[in-house]
């Protein structure tokens, strides 16, 4: 089957959001009626096609993922501009069990894997940036280079947003303090919101199964993109009650439910079971999506 890159990327984002994290799941879903209808394809890209898609990725695609993140953030902010953003700096261990490039023993976590830097918005939970690092890296290794593009983006594109940087003691370095002061950013070294748990368990950021380090870095970006799209969906269109629920609960109520796909001459209709207990939760977001005013340019 011939497949170009954008449809495969979209397929992987939908799969990750639905809880299918591995390339192999593509073969199981290839004839799934809902996936085929949403992607407008007669069949999904197969596991070998998906794996080749990832293996073609390089440093340039990493930069493109950052550009995609910035473009989407601008569109989300056109709907709901924040008054303040808390830049939550953190690091975590992505466990790796093979012979991946950059896999190493981390003495803090006492395990092998990668040790990425992450930056979330501590108010909304948006993942602003994630960067894969070798497993043996210290928490603060490369933090100023990691942070500067974020500060540049907010200071140039969103000058009215008040920035506060927050991190734990692992980031207590004079270089970071100086960087914040030179960029007019308040900072505090303290405990922070923990959004990493849902990122790792709900979106499997640890799916770093390729041997090549750059390929794994790109894989993480795809999972990060899926996380952010879900987080924006949760924040902008779910009800206040549903907004507090984690991805596993939302999957159970809105995604992993029985439906009948009906094809007509002009439309594809998804019919819910008459006894579906979450009909209201399902239809409310559809109505809210129709009311969004997104600035596309």
Where are these regions (language model features)?
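Anion-binding and metal-coordination hotspots
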Residues: 1-297
């Amino acid at each position: 089957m011939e497949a170009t890159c954008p449809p495969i990327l979209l397929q992987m984002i939908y799969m990750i959001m639905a809880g299918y994290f591995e390339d192999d799941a593509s073969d199981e879903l290839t004839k799934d009626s809902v996936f085929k209808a949403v992607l407008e394809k007669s069949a999904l890209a197969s596991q070998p096609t998906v794996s080749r898609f990832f293996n073609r990725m390089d440093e340039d695609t990493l930069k493109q993922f950052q550009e995609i993140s910035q473009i989407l953030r601008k569109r989300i902010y056109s709907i709901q501009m924040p008054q303040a953003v808390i830049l939550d700096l953190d690091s975590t261990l992505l466990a790796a069990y093979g012979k991946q490039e950059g896999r190493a023993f981390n003495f803090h976590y006492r395990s092998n894997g990668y040790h990425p830097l992450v930056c979330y918005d501590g108010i909304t939970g948006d993942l602003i940036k994630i960067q894969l690092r070798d497993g043996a890296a210290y928490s603060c290794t490369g933090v100023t280079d990691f942070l500067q593009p974020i500060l540049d983006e907010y200071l140039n594109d969103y000058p009215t947003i008040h920035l506060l940087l927050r991190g734990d003691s692992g980031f207590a370095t004079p270089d970071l303090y100086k960087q914040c002061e030179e960029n007019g950013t308040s900072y505090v070294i303290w405990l922070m919101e923990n959004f990493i748990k849902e990122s790792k368990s709900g979106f499997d950021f640890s799916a770093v199964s390729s041997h090549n380090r750059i390929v794994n870095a790109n894989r993480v970006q795809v999972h990060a993109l899926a996380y952010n799209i879900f987080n924006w969906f949760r924040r902008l269109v779910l009800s206040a009650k549903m907004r507090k629920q984690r991805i596993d609960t939302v999957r159970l109520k809105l995604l992993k439910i029985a439906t009948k796909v009906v094809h007509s001459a002009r439309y594809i209709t998804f019919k819910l079971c008459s006894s579906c207990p979450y009909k209201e939760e399902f239809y409310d977001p559809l109505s809210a999506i129709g009311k969004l005013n997104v600035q596309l340019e």
